Structures are given as C-alpha cells and as structure tokens.
C-alpha cells in the first residue's frame, strides 16, 4: 500500500469546484481570505503575485511545504498544494508488494484538526487525515481508486500518482511507496 504524501486542489477547475478542505486555524478552501490565512499561519516564506492569483508558500523542511493560492478578484482561497514527502517514523524506504506495510496497518487518523499548518492535518468530508496517509484509509472512508487515471504500481522508494473518486469529486494525489518488498 502507498501513502498519499501530497494533495493538490484547484477549485477553479471543474474537478475541484465541490471540494472544501478545512485546515488548522479555521482556514477553509473556497471560504477563507488571504488575510485570515496570514493571521493564522504568519508571514509565508514566499509571496508571489500573479495576474489572477496571490500564492503564499510555507515551508517545513525539504519536500514539506504548503502553497495557498488566493483568487485576486475575490481574495478567497481557491487553490492548495500540500506536500509532506517524508518517511514516517521507523520506516525504511526499500519494493512493490500488495501486502500492507506495518506503517499502513498502524496508521491512526487524527481525532481533530492540527494545531499548526505544519502538522499536515486536513479535514475533508467529515474525516481528519494527517499526511502522509495510507491510500487504504481514503478507501475505507468511501473513496474509490480510479485505476485508469492512476499509476498501476509504484516501486519501493518511488513516487507515483493516484486519482480517487467519491460522490462525483476527483482527488488527485501524489503517493510514495515506503514498502520493503
């Protein structure tokens, strides 16, 4: 089994229009403003102002970042890209197997929101997830793997992509295979 180590959601695309994600600090995709995000998370390490969007970047180490995109015309959080590409504690990156790893079997979902954005805890559809999250956890919560739009297999120590679907909504995710076989 693989972990989802990143989420990228763009509410301006038809696939992301119905996705509302709650982040720590009371920030919600498609509802919160840039000012609310800066108040909740502090100043970003980078702020880019494009033609249609203001993009804030928060970094929490190598391959661990959150980008929040706010529509210039509304000031509302319209896009998010979270990546937490790290090995979970005690995990050795090593081959492809259909057997769930010990880390997948021992994953415990958070019971509530994280305290800070760098906790990588999100709430979606009434469920809390802490990235990286096993794909199987999303499947247990009603998400279905779209095999046609997902990598067939991800070799150990490598990254791949999966598409999960639920109630007509698509979630595109980056996965990392932490298995040893």
Language-model regions: role of each:
Residues 111-142, 146-148:
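N-terminal export/targeting and maturation segments
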Residues 1-6, 32-109, 136-180:
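A cross-family detector of function-defining hotspots
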């Amino acid at each position: 089994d693989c972990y989802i180590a990143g989420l990228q959601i763009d509410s301006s695309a038809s696939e992301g229009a119905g996705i509302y994600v709650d982040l720590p600090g009371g920030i919600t995709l498609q509802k919160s403003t840039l000012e609310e995000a800066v108040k909740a998370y502090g100043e970003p390490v980078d702020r880019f102002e494009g033609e249609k969007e203001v993009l804030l970047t928060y970094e929490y180490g190598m391959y661990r970042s959150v980008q929040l995109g706010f529509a210039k015309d509304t000031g509302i959080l319209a896009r998010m890209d979270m990546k937490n590409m790290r090995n979970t504690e005690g995990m050795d990156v090593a081959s492809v197997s259909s057997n769930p790893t010990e880390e997948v079997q021992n994953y415990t979902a958070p019971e509530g929101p994280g305290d800070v954005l760098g906790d990588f805890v999100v709430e979606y559809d009434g469920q809390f997830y802490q990235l990286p999250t096993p794909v199987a956890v999303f499947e247990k919560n009603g998400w279905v793997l779209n095999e046609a739009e997902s990598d067939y297999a991800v070799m150990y120590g490598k990254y791949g992509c999966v598409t999960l679907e639920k109630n007509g909504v698509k979630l595109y995710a980056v996965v990392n295979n932490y298995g040893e076989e």
